[in-house]
Amino acid sequence: MCGIFAYMNYRVPKTRKEIFETLIRGLQRLEYRGYDSAGVAIDGNNHEVKERHIHLVKKRGKVKALDEELYKQDSMDLKVEFETHFGIAHTRWATHGVPNAVNSHPQRSDKDNEFVVIHNGIITNYKDLRKFLESKGYEFESETDTETIAKLIKYVFDNRETEDITFSTLVERVIQQLEGAFALVFKSIHYPGEAVATRRGSPLLIGVRSKYKLSTEQIPVLYPTCNIENVKNICKTRMKRLDSSTCLHAVGDKAVEFFFASDASAIIEHTNRVIFLEDDDIAAVADGKLSIHRVKRSATDDPSRAIQTLQMELQQIMKGNFSAFMQKEIFEQPESVFNTMRGRVNFETNTVLLGGLKDHLKEIRRCRRLIVIGCGTSYHAAVATRQVLEELTELPVMVELASDFLDRNTPVFRDDVCFFISQSGETADTLLALRYCKDRGALTVGITNTVGSSISRETDCGVHINAGPEIGVASTKAYTSQFISLVMFGLMMSEDRISLQNRRQEIIRGLRSLPELIKEVLSLDEKIHDLALELYTQRSLLVMGRGYNYATCLEGALKIKEITYMHSEGILAGELKHGPLALVDKQMPVIMVIMKDPCFAKCQNALQQVTARQGRPIILCSKDDTESSKFAYKTIELPHTVDCLQGILSVIPLQLLSFHLAVLRGYDVDFPRNLAKSVTVE
């Protein structure tokens, strides 16, 4: 939920101003992950051992407020140059403690800032740790769980058994006492020019840049000599010493830069060479050399971490000519849905091949049940495709909200196939559901938009939706690409079903025409803006439909409430008489999605009920639908496609409507209050 960014320059001279600029740009790339408050920690002016100082600057509000605050710091000389320096930065989405400067990160160990730490995640046992530390005389100043980590590493350091204990050993001892999810980056006055980072359940990657040859492409993983059982004994173990053969560095001890971040969008402008850390990895940089340690060894551990090349371009994470990332991403959907299908759907032979699933296809076809699990928009993509998946696979399909799935301890069997949908691949509840299903022997399939994410690594197989980076907090293009990915799975599963060939060909023809039809829908933007002008002063809104378009209503209502803060509700039209009809009157805006599909006649019944109660329905309908338009207050006519894909076309007007409503109401579309893009805590 929070954004972590850190930058180390080793033998690369940088002024403090240049370091600030790098840190701030990194935070701005991560601001969609949280924007309650932000902070940085950099070296002070003194380099003498007894006078070393870490300067903290923290500010409530967005990164821009922090940027302005940095240049008000009279005590810092922006022109001073550092040949080697390590700076850390953080943008926060509050989970413990209100958004203010004291609760912002970096959190510190004491008033002298001996150790500072930035954190993404939640420490579930922080109260016990805090109680222990308070009993040892450590004083706390914030309400955060993160401050416990800073105080704990200070405790380990204060009680060290030897003066030459390494920074990574301290961190190793600390994380064995932590329960919950975390990505952490540490800085200390006792280890100048050194960095230590670690993760468990929250994402963290390291970018490396050097104009010189690197020592290796595979960094070996190192292990400690023993494990620590409890917090009272954490000062009694040793880490073995390192040598250059176990580290990544520029050959000849030359200049090198390291970038630590929660995701790749903050790194790509600097380098496309990255290392994805695994859970419980501890990455340490000292003297320009990166080493990776692990707390425990298991038989399934990969013995090394490879440097990978990001397939991303900087322009993909820039707004271009659009006023907001969300608007840009809505208008990117003709390209994003094409990219999702590219190389997978052969329109000449009517075949579909998902390379990430091909090795497990026989096992998937033998399954007895499909379980599709997600949260928010990803859950809606599952709802949208449930009917066509049942039709094409001829299997029962359960669609589950990850949190509810876990709360119920849902029975899962070895002959189930479980899908986990997440744009970021890091959604905490979905990740926990994945581990729950793996423990019960089910085959697990990930559907994500992020290479190297936790879900993509931990599932048995998966589909990368190839939608491109999505920065706007309100998901748009990821939804339509997830939708198509699930449809493609159904098509692949039904390839040898003779009775379904005509239906398959109809759907594949629909997929082929989809990018052009989306462009046609996007051309209605001005008309939708005019509709928003009529609606933006309203306090509540109903969106109703049924069949294939029920998910459209859920997703449209979610988009409206996410970024406009209007109350909106997605209603199954078949449930209208069972309560929601009581809300309908001439003041209540009602949007109805009525398409020429098998539910058309039933939707007409719902329309009659709404108009009979003096409702003024705004209808999304097919171009040739004269019947619905007779009863409509307003209509938005959409091109027609095959019924199971119509939801892709009908959701786009609701995405546009939510965008225009938010702008007219004066809200920041890309940064809705209380929300973050990547939900990495429960």
Swiss-Prot record:
SUPFAM superfamilies on file: N-terminal nucleophile aminohydrolases (Ntn hydrolases), SIS domain
Record keyword Transcription regulation present: no
Domain SIS: 360-499, 531-672
Catalytic machinery residues: 2 (for gatase activity)
Gene Ontology MF terms: carbohydrate derivative binding; glutamine-fructose-6-phosphate transaminase (isomerizing) activity
Gene3D superfamilies per the UniProt record, alphabetical: Glucose-6-phosphate isomerase like protein, domain 1 (3.40.50.10490), Glutamine Phosphoribosylpyrophosphate, subunit 1, domain 1 (3.60.20.10)
Pathway assigned in UniProt: Nucleotide-sugar biosynthesis; UDP-N-acetyl-alpha-D-glucosamine biosynthesis; alpha-D-glucosamine 6-phosphate from D-fructose 6-phosphate: step 1/1
A UniProt-annotated Pfam family: GATase_6
Reaction(s) catalysed by this chain's protein: D-fructose 6-phosphate + L-glutamine = D-glucosamine 6-phosphate + L-glutamate
One Gene Ontology term from the biological process aspect of the record: glutamine metabolic process
Domain named Glutamine amidotransferase type-2: residues: 2-288
Leader sequence segment: none
EC number: 2.6.1.16
Enzyme class: transferase
Record keywords: Aminotransferase, Glutamine amidotransferase, Phosphoprotein, Repeat, Transferase
Binding site for substrate: 377-378, 422-424, 427, 578
Positions where Phosphoserine occurs in the chain: 244
Described purpose of this protein according to its UniProt entry: Controls the flux of glucose into the hexosamine pathway. Most likely involved in regulating the availability of precursors for N- and O-linked glycosylation of proteins.
Protein name: Glutamine--fructose-6-phosphate aminotransferase [isomerizing] 2
